[in-house]
Amino acid sequence: MSGFSIDHGGAISVDPDALRTIARRIDLAATRCEVAAESLASAHRTIVDTPGFTEHVDTVALWAAGHGASRLFEECLETAESTMLMADAYEYVELKAQADALALTDAAAAHDLRRRMAEMAAADGRVPELAEKLVHEWEQRRFGGLEPPYPANMIFGPLVWAAALLGASPRFGTVRPGSTLSGKADAVTIAPVATSSPKAPPTSLAGSLNRMPSASGAQVAVEKYSYADGRTKFVAYIVGTQTASMGGTQPWDMKSNRELYTGSASASYQATVDALTAAGAQPGDEVDVVSHSQAGMIAAYLSTASEFEVKVQIAAGSPTQVMGGEGQTVVGLTHTDDPVAALSGGGLPGGAGAPDSFTVTREADPDAGLDYTVLGAHGLDAYIETAEMADASDDPRVEELGEFWDELSKAETIERTEYRAERVEESE
């Protein structure tokens, strides 16, 4: 397990509020150490000043205990203060990322966030300086592990780094709130190729990735969850790129990759929307998404550009990072040696989505040698293995995702349909 981590995304390694909770607990411990130091010092004075007491008490050890408690008080106090400062710096990074995103859709809200940033900077000038340092350090390490090992790096290295640098551009790699797709997608047709009634929903990250379409040629699986109170919700499982061609009947191709990455409507996106509609999803319905590779971009734009309400999206190896809203849980799985994931530019400097959102990161194959394949770290199986590691962790955000699985389990019926889509080629 090389470099395995679960964090809130980018420079944000923990939730600022959680960090403040820790700081307050450390401060409470400091207070108790201070009380203990004062009590020990008082006891030492009393014993020393009282004739005959020193014969029965080791005053040297007592003084050392008091001195140790005093030093521990100072260390705890300093740690609490520095932890609170770090929490402010992390929040500052998040506020800046949110303000930059909202500038496109809600200038007033962006102004309010920048005003909050100004207040934090005025209260403690160290906050913006530390925030800038955090982002700088994140930028330096975000592509760590991406360079393939020798001798593959002689062939693929330049391609991988070109992809990473393209993703680092402010124009690409990030889907901001309110983002829409330009142009018109190629015409597609869809057809159901398999139906089933699963007995239970997925109960874990790995379990959700294992529910990708399995019928021959299927690219989208839609599960409809119906509840006793009449509610319905949908979960879409969308595969990644299926061919390296730049056109043809397969919508999940490099043409769709290029279109989605540059913000244009693609045949694969249109096919996904059509599949959801065919499964019964209507505007305003909750549609949650589990995706791999190219489908991560489809999921991102479903959350910002479609008429569906996307509350949870799980993306493995996505070329883009979505800046989800406060009410949206965004879960990303990224391998630092995955050149496709590198197109996201290393993710976002601030956290994405709701506080319970998280990013799982690791180097998929740190021991790769002569048998290295540039897309090995991008494979779905490798990401399922990463998801299993996350499921086995005790990270509270992974545990909170359990509420999503629990809600799905309350459905009375589950109807699953897998769809195959084809691009309609223009007649000559």
Question: Each predicted region: which residue ranges?
Answer:
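Short, hydrophobic/amphipathic alpha-helical packing segments
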Residues: 23, 269, 295-296
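Short secondary-structure boundary segments
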Residues: 29-43, 47, 167-185, 289-291
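Alpha/beta hydrolase fold serine-hydrolase catalytic domain that processes acyl esters and thioesters
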Residues: 61, 118-285, 307-428
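N-terminal secretion-targeting helices of virulence/extracellular proteins
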Residues: 1-114, 120, 428
